[in-house]
């Protein structure tokens, strides 16, 4: 077992999510229910009781925790540790690279995440929250990296996944998604065509549409970057 899994923080922490909020209208939605977009067709944002949170934790306490994505638990939407779906999301470094003008350039090396890209952050969070809310099937359109992350985390969680890729998706990405256990289709069209299939399929099958900004939780994982 890797050190990432040995050192993963298994403690429970206070939960500060208060509600979901429509990004356009500002009206509230119950964070304990499954939601995609608001009634206005806009993204839902997770809201926290920041006043209570400030009195509960310190930067120093967070810094002493294991160096992984979940060290920021109080600012994340998963209530219970048992619902965390993890593949070992380590903290990633800023790497200095040469610059023609002599100025410092820092690159965030997200390739160290479990599925090789920053997409692992968002899908780690979305799948964990989906597990907590009792979601059984998830689906998305993708050009590659997000689909691989969804497939990997759904396999870890025991959630069925469906992934739709446009015709020009590289074969290496297709194989990565397939080997992670997703139901995979190459669509004769563009990413928008894949998105339409997922949206139409949601109406028929009831699967959870985890397309970008069509659910509240992927962005919650990405903010840890």
Where are the model-predicted features located?
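PLP-dependent amino-acid enzyme catalytic core
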Residues: 2-225
